[in-house]
Amino acid sequence: MLHEFHVRRLLKFRVESCSSIHSLSLHPLYVIMSPMDIIGFNSTSDTGIRYCSYMCLIIICCVSGELFSA
């Protein structure tokens, strides 16, 4: 479970491989393709594995799955 402070800060990670996402062991994860195009997925899903090699930035959201504004 994420600490409230970390949730509010919306920690951002540079992602270079699928293992970078899996090592976080957190979900849901949201991958940013563009400011208006956000795709959500669980780190263990096939969809997440396919997307992670193309995306460079993820935002960790609160455990309820709601995306907080920065």
Curated annotation (Swiss-Prot):
For this protein, the record's InterPro entries field holds: DUF5432
Tell me the domain of life: Viruses
Q: What is this protein called?
A: Uncharacterized 8.0 kDa protein
Q: What is the lineage of its organism?
A: Viruses, Varidnaviria, Bamfordvirae, Nucleocytoviricota, Pokkesviricetes
